[in-house]
Amino acid sequence: MYRRITIAHLSDLHLAADDRTPRSEARLFGRLRGMNGHFERLLADPPLRASDLVVVTGDVTDHGDLAEWERFWSLVEAGGLRDRIAVLPGNHDVCCLGSRRRRPRAEDWARARAGLALGGHEWAFPWVRSVGGALTLFAVDAANAGNSSGLDNAVGRIGRRQLAELGRCLLLFQDAPLKLILIHHSPNIPHPATSRRRGERPAAFWERRALQLDPFDRRCLRLLAAVFRVKAILHGHTHDSLDRTVGGIRIIGAPASTEPDAAGCLRYKLHTLHVDSGRLASRTERVPAAPARPARVH
């Protein structure tokens, strides 16, 4: 059994078929390109390579295309990480952008499952995986609520069937010493007053509606986590680096890992689980998005 387990936690990669293709989400200064190259740089980062597990909490691809999934798995394979990666889909992986329908069609879900299967990965949710003899992962699919408007495909829902099955899995593994739940959508977006008190930017109403699970699902998820003493819930979707405790449950969000921050760095979370004490330490790792230029010699 491992005495310490390290987890590199990435999210919202938004990989494209090639680096010339821009990300679908608009930004103030144009659409982001180069996500694939950024992911390659992240996979070469020494702390990530030394980790026991690499977790990607959704939005692996930008449009859910199989060509994007193939690019993801080829980069993972080239990095020698296929046997220690855990992946789950996000709303972009079950992609139905625009107002053409409210819920994803069966072929969209089938395409996401096929993308996971390309890497020989679990695709039926919830799934359970043991790591290092001490850690148990419980992965949940929340990318199944469809569009709430023509501007949003981001709403998350777990559903009662999956919640019941998650509860059954947690009961079966109730004696596992360390448990983590993986999900794409956030189980909590603070009210504006709470955000201001923390010194954070308050989320607008539409952001809170789109970036977190619906009220029933998020309360059930947090209740299950509390009852079965889950160490933390790891998520993505907000594109922010977050770490907070809600109702006694630690909730940690990874940033959009292939999107450079204001300093030009790519970011991911590095979690360390101390098996003997049960302590979970978490920090944000930063990787320059572009290699440093050699100094000019005069």
Regions found by a protein language model. Give the residues of each.
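N-terminal active-site segment of His-dependent metallophosphoesterases
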Residues: M1-R71
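Active-site neighborhood of phospho(di)ester-bond hydrolases with catalytic His/Asp-centered motifs
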Residues: H9-S11, L53-D59, I85-N91, V140, ...
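Active-site environment of divalent metal-dependent phosphoester hydrolases
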Residues: H14-D19, D62-A67, P89-S99, N144-G150, ...
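Conserved beta-sheet core of the metallophosphoesterase superfamily
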Residues: E77, R198-S277
